Structures are given as structure tokens and as C-alpha cells.
UniProtKB/Swiss-Prot annotation:
PANTHER family, A to Z: 40S RIBOSOMAL PROTEIN S19 (PTHR11710:SF0)
Top-level taxon of origin: Eukaryota
Gene Ontology biological process terms from the UniProt entry: ribosomal small subunit assembly; translation
InterPro entries: Ribosomal_eS19, Ribosomal_eS19_CS, WH-like_DNA-bd_sf, WH_DNA-bd_sf
Keyword Transmembrane helix included in the entry's annotation: no
CC annotations in GO: cytosolic small ribosomal subunit
Membership in a protein family: Belongs to the eukaryotic ribosomal protein eS19 family.
Protein name per UniProt: Small ribosomal subunit protein eS19
GO MF entries: RNA binding; structural constituent of ribosome
Keywords: Ribonucleoprotein, Ribosomal protein
Pfam families on file: Ribosomal_S19e
């Protein structure tokens, strides 16, 4: 049994898979990504220049762990606290258009496919790509010497 996505750190995996998506050059980044907010609860657009690839990698990881998932579930996952000044804060969903466009572009790369029961799921090729990236970043453990008692 090899290394899977569940065996590595989520942060390291997301960064590595985002770099893989960016390096492949097959995923087109829309021009509106420089100035769009990721939700109505945000004040500014993301500071990270590669946030689009990072969000795509994060979506792939979520689909690996819990599949199938639709646009609404990603709105909830990436949602946050809306600050309303002196009024109490409330939860607010994230932008669904970003999740939808990302899933459509991942479908074009044959990483994600539509599930017949609703939502999206990883393809076998997508699962294989994710496991391969996870195996590359997994720490190489040296075999430990047997303990003598």
C-alpha cells in the first residue's frame, strides 16, 4: 500500500499540487482573478498571486477525502465570518462562481468528473495524480534498527 493524500500534511500537499497545476500550464487562469473577492465577507482580494491554483488544489484534496461534493458544499467550506460592525457576526458563504469555474477547469483536465447522483468526484486519473504528488512530498523514513533489550 502506497502513500495517499491522507498520509501527508494538508498544507504541504496543497502547495505541491498547486505548483504541479501551475507548472503543467494546462489550467487557464481567468483575468478577473487579480481583483475578485473570494466571498462577500471579505474586504480585499487574496494577496497570494497563485491563489487560484491553491484553491484548485484544495478543492481536489477535499474531493479526495469526501466525495462527491457540489458547489454548495464548497461555498460552505470556504465561507467565513461576516463582520457587521457593532452588530453580531454571522456566517456567510463563499463565492460560488469561483468554485464552479475551478471545477469546470478541473473537469477539462480530466481530474474531476460529474457524479450521476449530483456533485463532482475525482476521476481515476485525478486520484492517481494526487497520490503521486503525495508520494513525492512524503518524508523518506529510514528503516529503524531493531531494538535490543
Amino acid at each position: 500500500m502506497g502513500i495517499s493524500v491522507k498520509d501527508v500534511s494538508s498544507h504541504e500537499f496543497t502547495r505541491a499540487f498547486a505548483a504541479f497545476l501551475k507548472k503543467s500550464g494546462k489550467m487557464k487562469v481567468p483575468e478577473w482573478t487579480d481583483f475578485v473577492k473570494t466571498g462577500m465577507f471579505k474586504e480585499l482580494s487574496p494577496y497570494e498571486p497563485d491563489w487560484y491554483f491553491i484553491r484548485a488544489a484544495s478543492i481536489c484534496r477535499h474531493l479526495y477525502i469526501r466525495s462527491p461534493a457540489g458547489i454548495g458544499s464548497f461555498e460552505k467550506i470556504y465561507g467565513g465570518r461576516r463582520r457587521r460592525g457593532t452588530a453580531p457576526s454571522h456566517f456567510c458563504k463563499a463565492n460560488g462562481s469561483i468554485s464552479r469555474r475551478l471545477l469546470q477547469s478541473l473537469e477539462g483536465l480530466k481530474i474531476v468528473e460529474k457524479d450521476p447522483n449530483g456533485g463532482r468526484r475525482l476521476t481515476s486519473q485525478g486520484r492517481r495524480d494526487l497520490d503521486r504528488i503525495a508520494a513525492q512530498i512524503a518524508p523518506k523514513r529510514a528503516p529503524s534498527a531493531p531494538k535490543t533489550v
